[in-house]
């Protein structure tokens, strides 16, 4: 909806297509669907798809610009741009700022996209949450990883909270939501750190 509102604000004509209203339900593949949309004269295509890498694949397949509005648990660069804009609006220059991203990092497309953008702007990024949702492998991408929320909040210039991505998980990655909230929830006392 946000892209549609933004486009209409800029006087663009918008056609919203859902998977249910497209030929995908009749067996047409995503590539052919997008090629048909291009043939109908689209100037750009905004896509949100459950398959990781779908936007990149399509950008290499067709000639019109593809805007990635989220692809599975892979990326969500448009949300990251909005988050980074908001952080810069509130904090100014992000170089050297300490940004903590707390929550379900493993299944979050927003966390990855924010990490790449924030690092490019010189921010220090910390991922925090339970070890089952914040694996150490994210250190290889440039993040500091901690499973101690108090350490993550110390000296943070900004904290981003991510919800648990239940829809992308096939099993529970923590004993219960109440236990997760008790250990990793941002409480008023912690927000003053």
Model-identified regions with their sequence ranges:
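Solvent-exposed alpha-helices and their adjacent loops that cap or buttress functional pockets
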Residues: 36-39, 58-61, 65, 91-95, ...
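Glycine-rich phosphate/diphosphate-binding loop of Rossmann-like nucleotide-binding domains
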Residues: 1-6, 89-162
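Phosphate/diphosphate ligand-binding glycine-rich loop within oxidoreductases
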Residues: 1-85
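Short glycine-rich anion-binding loops that position phosphate/pyrophosphate groups of nucleotides
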Residues: 50-51, 105, 163-168
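Short, flexible loop segments at the rims of nucleotide/cofactor-binding pockets, characterized by
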Residues: 21-25, 44, 103-105, 138-139, ...
């Amino acid at each position: 909806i946000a892209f549609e509102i933004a486009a209409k604000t800029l006087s663009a004509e918008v056609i919203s297509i859902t998977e249910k209203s497209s030929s995908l339900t009749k067996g047409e593949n995503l590539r052919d669907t997008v090629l048909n949309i291009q043939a109908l004269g689209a100037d750009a295509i905004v896509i949100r798809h459950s398959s990781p890498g779908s936007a990149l694949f399509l950008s290499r397949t067709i000639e019109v610009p593809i805007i990635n509005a989220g692809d599975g648990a892979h990326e969500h660069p448009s949300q990251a741009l909005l988050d980074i804009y908001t952080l810069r609006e509130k904090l100014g220059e992000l170089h050297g700022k300490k940004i903590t991203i707390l929550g379900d990092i493993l299944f979050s497309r927003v966390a990855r996209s924010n990490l790449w953008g924030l690092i490019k702007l010189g921010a220090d990024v910390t991922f925090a949450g339970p070890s089952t949702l914040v694996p150490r492998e994210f250190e290889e991408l440039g993040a500091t990883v901690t499973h101690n929320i108090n350490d993550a909040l110390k000296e943070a210039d900004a904290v981003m909270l991510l919800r648990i991505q239940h829809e992308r998980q096939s099993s529970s990655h923590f004993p219960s939501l109440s236990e997760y909230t008790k250990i990793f929830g941002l409480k008023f006392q912690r927000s003053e750190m």
